[in-house]
Amino acid sequence: WKYVIDQMSYFEFIGRPPMLKHLWSLSVEEQFYFVWPAVAFLLMRRWNRRGVRWVAIALALLSTAWMIRLSVSNAYFDPTNPIDPSRAYFGTDSHAMGLLVGAALATFWRPGRLQAAVPTGARVIVTGTGVAALVAVLGFFLFVGEDTAWMYTRGGFLVLALVVALLIAMATHPASPLGGWLGTQPWRYIGQRSYGLYLWHWPIFMVTRPTLDVPLDGLPLLVLRLGLTFGIAELSYRFVE
């Protein structure tokens, strides 16, 4: 929220960006973790899991609608005079849909109660759906950016959250081999160290700017950055985390 109040841009900067700028997403998470357990507890006392689920869904839709409203009313993506969309991107109110979709999923998806022995057709459907969701997530990663207009104006962040929720559900279904595939190396190694990789990648990238900080560019620079990121994340995982 400090970034929002200071009108700091996530997308544009002059000089070296703040070393801890990427921690905004962890701030959104922690704010959610402070508030949502109490909300869920009160809802469970009055209703049940179903009540928690519908409130989470409603709030996810409201967060998405608010992001759309901010994007349209502020003309973030006006082709003649676009405005920086950082307010909608940084805001907990406008970027909480993913957390809320996860909260909704947790109220009804219980893979431990599902059967691993299912008909072949059902196994194919579960596995195929999971693989399709995984491909879709990779497609978002490769071809969609945080400054893509329809992510803001058409509910793209909610769509991505739903696809990820579907992937989680199918990967944890006992009848699907997808979870086993994702649990093999090197994916398990990366997953175990993903928090450290996220924490360290940004400052490392910011102190290795091409030509400005290091005499490298392109693939050699990427190799250096990834090597440093994985190396420091490994030390962090072993001796700190």
Predicted regions and their residues:
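Membrane-interface helix/loop caps of multi-pass membrane proteins
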Residues: 1-241
